[in-house]
């Protein structure tokens, strides 16, 4: 979700003031009022009073840092992670989960000018099945740093635990660090990516120089000992599969094989609920033709095909289109057609646009889908489900449907990333009958 402030920074005197926070924004910042404008203060919750130092003063808003908290909210909780406040991964571990969801729900409602009907959430801890950890060898200490970037900085926070990771990946962290620290090429390691597939964990190691045979042997032994699939990435475009079987996950009971480079939702529990909700909202009938835009490798497309007459998936990444086709065949689905097309170009010239559809689902990236919204109107589907990772572009694109006579029937906030400022959502639009 983007913030809309762009005025030039104004010099402050680092004045110390006492404020009472009355709201929490979706990013976990406390919101107070000072001299008639919003004052954002990280680390302070609604109804808490604090002494703060003004550090930024703009025409429409100001920012401050906490000097001393004077009162505590009953919604305050002790952060579970020892790295919270330094690591840039989480911003809201100090706030209760109900408060986090309430603030995100309120922000979504304000943008959409409508009450939020549902909050779709899963486990608040141990939910993340994918993580990329930066690696950096420190010559002075002769130690390998492994962790996440600091908030608003490039420095690496060495992590020994991460409670938002699924337990299988969190348990691997010490062993991965020990293994990588024992490599002779540890000065040439870029990052390590860990993914928990349904058939076990996998590790991708990015290295910037060739690994000697002894290092490759150590890594292969490590992957065998810990039952994980191993991939090496000597270049960003190259992926070498060293050990283990291809990873897969399930979506509505279907098995989707993926490459470590492919996009998958990091929160499996919420993803499963999201897919089921989309299927329910679309109210699919056996005779329906369904269009799935920005379909990826078929996270929605394939489950849709188990309930509809025919499904068309459109995606801009060639590798994902190929994976979608392979997974359709693997699951015995012959009523699916995938198209590789750039949906930011003139879609009216694309082959899929010549077909008619009864229902449409779209799941675009943060930029939204301004280029395809007019064509969706021309298709005149009875129902449209829009899944969004950016409520600002969702609100913009929704106006196109609303002005064309569609109505919002359901609005849900997806708590895909607890303890962070990320806000995802999904909306059901239905065409008004004339």
UniProtKB/Swiss-Prot annotation:
Q: Which residues bind S-adenosyl-L-methionine?
A: 265, 294, 299, 315, 342, 363
The UniProt entry, under HAMAP family, shows:
23SrRNA_methyltr_RlmD
The UniProt entry, under CDD domains, shows: AdoMet_MTases
Q: What is this protein's name? A: 23S rRNA (uracil(1939)-C(5))-methyltransferase RlmD
- Name the family: Belongs to the class I-like SAM-binding methyltransferase superfamily. RNA M5U methyltransferase family. RlmD subfamily.
Give the matching PANTHER family. Answer: 23S RRNA (URACIL(1939)-C(5))-METHYLTRANSFERASE RLMD, RNA M5U METHYLTRANSFERASE
* Broadest EC class assigned to this enzyme: transferase
Catalytic reaction(s) noted: uridine(1939) in 23S rRNA + S-adenosyl-L-methionine = 5-methyluridine(1939) in 23S rRNA + S-adenosyl-L-homocysteine + H(+)
- Function, please? Catalyzes the formation of 5-methyl-uridine at position 1939 (m5U1939) in 23S rRNA.
Write the Enzyme Commission number(s) for this entry: 2.1.1.190
Amino-acid positions noted as binding [4Fe-4S] cluster in the UniProt annotation, renumbered to this chain: 81, 87, 90, 162
Active site residues according to the UniProt entry: 389 (nucleophile)
Question: Keywords, A to Z?
Answer: 4Fe-4S, Iron, Iron-sulfur, Metal-binding, Methyltransferase, rRNA processing, S-adenosyl-L-methionine, Transferase
Gene Ontology molecular functions = 4 iron, 4 sulfur cluster binding; iron ion binding; RNA binding; rRNA (uridine-C5-)-methyltransferase activity
Q: Where is the TRAM domain?
A: 10-68
Report any one BP term from Gene Ontology: rRNA base methylation
